[in-house]
Structure formats: structure tokens, C-alpha cells
Amino acid sequence: MHKFIPSEGTKDKDSLTLLLLHGTGGDETDLIPIARMLEITNASILSPRGKVIENGMPRYFRRLAEGIFDIEDLKFRTNELADFVQSASKTYALDLNRIIAIGYSNGANIAASVLLVRPEILSDAILFRPMIPLVPNTLPNLSSKRVLISAGLHDPIVASYQTKDLFDLLEKVGAKVSIQWQNSGHELTQRDMIAARKWLSLL
């Protein structure tokens, strides 16, 4: 299940697609208000619902415990999501070179996984409250990718070192990655929106 909202502006070579990836317990509508706050008039929205159910809550991949991922399922779901985006790009005539993932929590983690495993699918990414999902056996070259990490200094779910580890990995593989620390926990705040808008304005 997914939601697609075409761009409100004129479709041209600069048109973007925002791939919205919700957190645990969310659905395909959760991040649409967030996308609207970013004020990008030439962006279409593609928002899939996670297919894994944990205690009645949708997620994008299984986990064994808090912060401990089922890596085999993560790999499978990463490729499944990448294949979905590829198929949707044909269905909706989207430019695969202009797809920006905007992920929160579990959605940010699978967005990072797509960057690391199927980098051809995404041009850039905004990751809210992420951690390292996996380290692939073969590291990609992400020198053409731009990534914003927005993390909470008081996040009870993602420790600061886990965020820093992801930053270091993305930097190691060449991504143009920046990190913004918010005076918050795991929840999103207005400061996250300000940071994301500013980052997007520089693309």
C-alpha cells in the first residue's frame, strides 16, 4: 500500500520526488504534513507503508529487539523497497536521479540501507533519528549523494554514538553528509523542519 501525490508545480527537469518513509507504527500518510512543511512546490510525493507488522504496528523490516535488527530481513526489505521505487518511477514517470528519501526512525534506517545497498535508487536523503542499519560486504561509492542527519541530543532510542557511527560510515564511502543535533529526544521538532528546509534550499 502506498500513496502518490503528483507535484503541484510544473513538471520539468528540476522536478523532485520525495520518498517518505514513516517510523514504527506509522503509515503512508504520516510524513505528508512534514513534506508540506518543507515547502517544495516542484516535488511529487511517493509514500509506501511498511510491510512488516510488529505488535500491530507497520515497520519496514523486522527487528529482534530494540536497536537489534534482523539483518537478513533488512537486506530483503531493502531490495524490495528499492524495486518498488524503481517500478513506481515507471508507473508515475519519475526521474530516478531526483529522488530524495525523507525517513524518520525506522524509515530513516531503511533509507540509509537503500543508500548503502542500492545507491542507484536515491539521489539524496534526509534522515531523522537514524542509526547504522547494516554495513554491506561491498561498500558503495556515494560521492554523488548528499545526506542530512538530524538527531536528538536526548534521544532515548538512538544513542549519540550510533548516530555518529552512521555519519562516519557515510563519510567514509564519500557521501556529502552533514549532521544537525537538536535539543530534543526521538520526537520531531520545529528545529528539524528548519534544518531540513535550509539543507534542501542548498541542493
State what each model feature region is.
Residues 164-167, 171-203:
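C-terminal catalytic histidine-bearing segment of alpha/beta-hydrolase fold enzymes
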Residues 1-94:
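Serine-hydrolase catalytic machinery in alpha/beta-hydrolase-like enzymes
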Residues 31-34, 159-169:
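Short alpha-helix in the alpha/beta-hydrolase fold that links the catalytic acid
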Residues 148-151, 155:
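Short beta-strand/loop motif that positions the catalytic acidic residue
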Residues 120-132:
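A conserved short beta-strand
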Residues 93-103:
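Alpha/beta-hydrolase fold nucleophile elbow
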Residues 103-107, 111:
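Gly/Ala-rich beta-loop-alpha elbow adjacent to hydrolase catalytic centers
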Residues 33, 113-117:
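Active-site signature of alpha/beta-hydrolase-fold catalytic machinery across serine-
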